[in-house]
Amino acid sequence: MPTVKSLNQAMTYIRNVINTSLRTEVLDAVRKEEAKQVQSVVYDSYQPTVYERRYDMGNDANIVGMVNGTVLQVENITPPNSEGNPPPTTDKDLAKVVETGVGYDYFSPGARPFTQATMDALSASGAHVDALKNGLVKAGIRVK
């Protein structure tokens, strides 16, 4: 940790370290858990008959995070499936359709709330907290 001359400098440094850890270690922990929950809650719940599944919702590139004011906001931005006749989810928010079960143009398998399942699993495991602590330690900040 660098030498600081004021409380404001210390707070600025700590906020920057927290934000860096949120963007890296914590986001990685959330991505890993969301991928598990997508597999369990979404993919394992039923086998589609109208379209061929792409298995993209658990892909790291589709689980993005943005840090604002030491808060990490995570969003699944998997694009709609444009395959099939008619395309099953084109021009729709795929994550919202899957989460709510509303917006299908054919048989709906119902709501598959993978985001809540992710939050519940993280709450139970504390993996996101451990990830933040690891990021702080990596930056030279002692944590308990």
For each feature predicted by the language model, list its residue ranges.
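Short, Lys/Arg-rich flexible segments
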Residues: 1-73, 99-144
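Mid-chain, well-packed structural core segment of small domains
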Residues: 68-100
